[in-house]
């Protein structure tokens, strides 16, 4: 969110810098600059919020919380970095408008402020909120209020700002980038054809992307957890596995219910995806109701006897012939409990290689089919499967489903907002089109890179819409502003020289931020950082290469 927030600051401050050559007061420069870029920033904030909040349809608590928190953070970034930061900058420059004075001192103060700000956030979250707040207040005092006070005391009246004529390497790079995007924008039909072919191929690849859970995608392969799982698979293989749970509730003392449970166990014995012991028998974690019935030496054909036996097991545990406690009552209650006039029981089975999501999905589907014959039994009131592998499988399915829901919702809502704001279908449409390209390119690259859809990467689709629409809005809004008073050639040139370069700066800052996350030791965070950095780069390409070509075509018409 810090990386995204910088985008607001880059655009507003860049527009303010464009007005610095005008011989007017600093306050008027800020008003003119924000008057030009303010509507674009507001639209960008709204579209960002829509994209993030679309994740609340996911049905997964962590993803919903992510969407809500990101929406709040987008609003905070808009206020603090989009409005407050350039306003403070204009005030500081109005006090100390000699740009060549104390360059070294201002550089030291900037570095100190940035370092203390970053450190205060880390300390606030990980060490102590009180110490973090003290660091923030110290930062404001030392690097904002004190410099302003000192600058105001030594203020000099300078009528005209000195213009720096020397071009550093950054200015030269900006000019080269500007020339490239203007050259491409002047060949709109060829540009659109090339990117349309790229999009068609990337869409083909994106549709082949699969949702899966791999432990290696979430945890460091050298961590004790992953090493332990590898050793478990190596030494025990198909004789154990992650535990899946079959739940059955009803009048289980009924002999027919006992026969049905025996039939279920017999059917499961033939399932190769379930763990079997060295003798080839189905592995059922002890104690279970079938083994308890065998150990108590009851036939299971007498309902009253069954009920009394079950109640004794729950209250007293399993006592052997020598009057020794074999299973305590507490242990029995992990397998068998009484709820009113009904009993509930669970059968725990092993699922080998459950880290492979295809295996887990197969197990879930097959077990659900095997339980279907209990549907019409009057003595069975409830049944189902649960356990960590199946919960995880459902979460992944929900994540994939949320991806298919959140992307259309975010795109449609953004289009409606743009349509109302621009009051033009063609400008709203061409602003949204590049976003679809970004999503297609992103998931196509994910397929090529061997990534998969999981609880983390599924959210990036909606984020890509938020970032992409943000970039597109700035280009379209600036172009509409310039086209009112210039020809489309001049409007395009001013848009790309001004807003296009600002997009380059904001994109680079975000790419750097997420690329750093790509070095995280946990693959979950590392892949998120890498994919998001790629997504921001694609959003930049789409906004400065594809969108200008579309704007040229619709403006000519």
Stretches found by the model and what they are:
Residues 62, 164, 171, 215-221, ...:
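N-terminal start-of-chain detector that recognizes signal peptides
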Residues 202-230:
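Hydrophobic alpha-helical transmembrane segments in integral membrane proteins
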Residues 221-418, 435-436:
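Structured non-transmembrane domains adjacent to transmembrane bundles in polytopic membrane proteins
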Residues 1-213, 355-365, 369-557:
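Membrane-embedded transmembrane helical bundles of large multi-pass transporters/channels
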